[in-house]
Amino acid sequence: MISQIDKTELLERFLHYVSFHTQSKPNAKHSPSSVGQMKLAMQLQKELIQLGLENVEVSKYAVVTAFLPANDPNLTKTIGLVAHLDTSPQCSGKNVRPEVIEEYRGGDIALGIGEEFISPVYYSFMQKLVGQTLIVTDGTTLLGADNKAGIAEIMTALSILQKENIPHCNIRVAFTPDEEIGLGIHYFPMEKFSCDWAYTIDGGEVGELEYENFNAATAKVRFFGRNIHTGYAKGKMLNALTLACEFQQVFPVDEVPEKTDGKVGFYHLEDFSGDIEQVELTYLIRDFDEQNFAQRKAFIKNQVEKFNAKKGLKKPIELEIQDSYQNMYDVVKNVPQSIELADRAMKAVGIKPNHKPIRGGTDGAFLASKGLACPNIFTGGYNFHSKHELVSLQGMENTVQVIIEMLKCKDL
């Protein structure tokens, strides 16, 4: 078990990391998309050097890499640990003011001095957290547990390994920028991250072990109109907003995020922007099954073609589809040790593994596309990307315990 001083260190690390404003910018053309990510990267470089890691580097893209050699000649495997620097652009991450609740007694939690609160009426998982120390927001920003809890857990595990001289395998560490917008991982230096397999520490509830994720793409549909004074518009105006609203009606009403779960895919209208003369709709396309994923992309393409044929527009609507990431399972299944080791580590510290698909993506999906198996491990956090985000300190401790147990590389 982790000592009290280590629990304090873990909390202090987390509170320090969330003080960095690292929100990524979705329309950025370069990485890192925000200055704060580089600042946090430089801070982590300094701490990794202090912990005695080797080859600690920060690239111009704010990718942090480091290496800790095995301290036991019998432990020859190399395991990677990955977490990301940025926070979601979907909710403000500036001036995060965490609040620590010792021994949560149940019931609603008021956030700051405003009207925001977290209630077990809406979030049933809170009933499992009674008696634990919770870190919440003040109701004005997200918390940043996604993924600074993961960073704090990795750093604390490394600190304990070094202080207590615990036998461990070779360890590679990477902290990446712009995971939330799928940008930074494209600048990942694979040549500096040679390992047998790796883990992203980017999951949620205690026990989560994830090695299947969505296939993902983004579709942008552009509509072009013609504006004229409304008093004289008959037979002359073409309203791009109206065209876009009509097009949106072709999508299946039940195949949306708010009506699907498990391994069921969806279309998600993420953004609707523009005016009478030009509108752009942005859709997220998600599915676990590769064939269904291809069919979803074909569906949008076919609907655009039908819409253009039906309307006979002088300037037809345009479609752009960009793949984001792929399901990692096809790679992970060929490295079953990556799942077995995480399973054994959780059981060794009294945690029941919960294998579940990720209804999203991680940096591990990209690493898998490069041939590196990279399952995802829990952080103890909940309600990511929102003002209701929270993390359990005990859950974070559990993650540290699992990381240390995995790095012992027993029976490999």
Curated annotation (Swiss-Prot):
Enzyme class, broadest EC rank: hydrolase
Catalytic activity: Release of the N-terminal residue from a tripeptide
Principal place of residence: cytoplasm
Pfam families xrefs: M20_dimer, Peptidase_M20
Positions bound to Zn(2+) 1: H84, D146, D202
Note accompanying the cofactor annotation: Binds 2 Zn(2+) ions per subunit.
GO biological process, one term: peptide catabolic process
Active-site residues, as the UniProt record annotates them: D86, E179 (proton acceptor)
PROSITE patterns (alphabetical): ARGE_DAPE_CPG2_1, ARGE_DAPE_CPG2_2
Entry EC no(s): 3.4.11.4
GO cellular component: cytosol
Protein's cellular compartments: Cytoplasm
Swiss-Prot/TrEMBL keywords: Aminopeptidase, Cytoplasm, Hydrolase, Metal-binding, Metalloprotease, Protease, Zinc
SUPFAM superfamilies attached to this UniProt entry: Bacterial exopeptidase dimerisation domain, Zn-dependent exopeptidases
Annotated Zn(2+) 2 binding sites: D146, E180, H385
Cofactor(s) the protein needs: Zn(2+)
Organism domain of life: Bacteria
InterPro entries hit by this protein: ArgE/DapE_CS, Bact_exopeptidase_dim_dom, Peptidase_M20, Peptidase_M20_dimer, Peptidase_M20B
Purpose: Cleaves the N-terminal amino acid of tripeptides.
Family as reported in the entry's similarity comment: Belongs to the peptidase M20B family.
PANTHER family on file: PEPTIDASE T
Entry protein name: Peptidase T
Originating species: Haemophilus influenzae (strain ATCC 51907 / DSM 11121 / KW20 / Rd)
Record gene name: pepT
